[in-house]
């Protein structure tokens, strides 16, 4: 084992994508089973994966996944940083292992690492990235991470991370992590509103780092619940089973939370009022100097327009008539939408906005470790 690791280390010094792959790679994976050589093997594997996506793809092709998944069951503190780094590289390229991670409770390993104050913020940011990848468009991952208290942990670390002495990288991934966690998760969104999550994130809209501001806009915009579209039938008349399953998983988790006594529900009027507050908070982002912030603001407002389309259309029609000198009164809103209405100036519907069908740069794009 020692000779094989040394040979692999020599290859790392001189190898590249253009050269033949290392012959020792399958053996190095076997070395992970040896406790005495495990740390050195993991460090060398981390160096190899850091050479680029081609290295990650090669490692996956020779079967690295079951080995590093098994290691998440260990409690050795000296392995934690390098394991989190390796999983960051894997999930940046391949999200297909979401289900296996959740099935084996691998998410708990990263939540504990994230909640370790003695670990440097930059390393905990990698754990936040991994958890964001686990919950990205994955209802089962969202449910189990929420049940493990991920939302409360992320919010509890925001004040220190966003302080002048904090890490902008860490605070950015905390925002992205909670945004992915509660996106289209209605009961968790209700719990977030009731626990003051928007108030904890809103100060980050004035952060000097544009990426942090954009992540904060995304996290706030993800609190706006957009009901799933109707299941579209294909040419054979069969529905999208995956979409039905995802909706059912969230519905089941919502019911379980209610049976457990969690205050996860909001009245429609209260939710509309909370969404109106979010809109007012993020609205200045349309004139932000950063294009990334402006894009995320447009996407968040697009979610709002999707949910309250009738109110937006009514307000836009009123605004056009008022601008042309018609002098017509403000449109009336129903009971469910009245709390959403702006008093006085109707700025939320100031003009026609194009329909937004695409996700934002942060909210909808694929994850990468450099972001």
Predicted feature residues:
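Buried hydrophobic core positions in alpha-solenoid tandem helical repeats
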Residues: 25-29, 67-69, 109-114, 153-158, ...
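Short coil/turn segments at helix-helix junctions and helix-capping linkers
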Residues: 32-36, 55, 70-79, 97, ...
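Short, hydrophobic/charged alpha-helical patches characteristic of ARM/HEAT alpha-solenoid repeats
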Residues: 15-20, 55-61, 97-104, 141-148, ...
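Alpha-helical solenoid repeat architecture
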Residues: 10, 40-51, 81-95, 125-138, ...
């Amino acid at each position: 084992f020692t000779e094989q690791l040394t040979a692999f280390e020599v290859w790392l010094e001189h190898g590249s994508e253009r050269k033949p792959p290392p012959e020792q790679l399958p053996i190095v994976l076997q070395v992970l089973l040896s406790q005495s050589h495990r740390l050195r093997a993991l460090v060398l594997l981390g160096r190899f994966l850091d050479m680029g996506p081609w290295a990650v793809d090669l490692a996956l092709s020779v079967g690295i996944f079951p080995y590093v998944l098994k290691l998440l069951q260990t409690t050795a503190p000296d392995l934690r940083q390098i394991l989190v780094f390796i999983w960051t590289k894997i999930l940046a390229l391949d999200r297909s292992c979401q289900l296996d991670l959740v099935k084996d409770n691998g998410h708990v390993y990263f939540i504990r690492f994230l909640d370790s104050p003695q670990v440097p913020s930059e390393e905990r940011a990698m754990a936040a990235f991994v958890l964001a990848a686990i919950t990205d468009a994955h209802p089962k991952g969202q449910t189990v991470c929420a049940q493990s208290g991920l939302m409360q942990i992320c919010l509890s670390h925001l004040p220190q991370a966003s302080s002048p002495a904090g890490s902008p990288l860490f605070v950015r991934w905390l925002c992205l992590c909670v945004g992915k966690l509660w996106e289209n998760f209605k009961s968790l969104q209700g719990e977030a509103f009731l626990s003051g999550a928007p108030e904890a994130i809103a100060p980050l809209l004035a952060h000097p780092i544009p990426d942090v501001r954009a992540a904060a806009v995304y996290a706030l915009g993800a609190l706006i619940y957009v009901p799933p579209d109707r299941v579209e039938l294909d040419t054979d008349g069969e529905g999208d089973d995956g979409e039905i399953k995802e909706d059912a998983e969230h519905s089941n988790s919502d019911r379980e939370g209610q049976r457990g006594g969690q205050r996860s529900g909001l009245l429609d009027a209260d939710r509309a009022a909370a969404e109106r507050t979010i809109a007012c908070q993020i609205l200045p982002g349309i004139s932000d100097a950063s294009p990334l912030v402006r894009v995320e603001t447009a996407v968040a407002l697009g979610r709002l327009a999707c949910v309250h389309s009738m109110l937006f259309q009514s307000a836009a029609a009123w605004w056009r008539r008022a601008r042309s000198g018609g002098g017509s009164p403000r449109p009336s809103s129903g009971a469910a939408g009245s709390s959403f209405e702006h008093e006085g100036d109707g700025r939320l519907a100031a003009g026609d906005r194009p329909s937004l069908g695409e996700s934002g740069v942060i909210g909808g794009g694929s994850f990468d470790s450099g972001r």
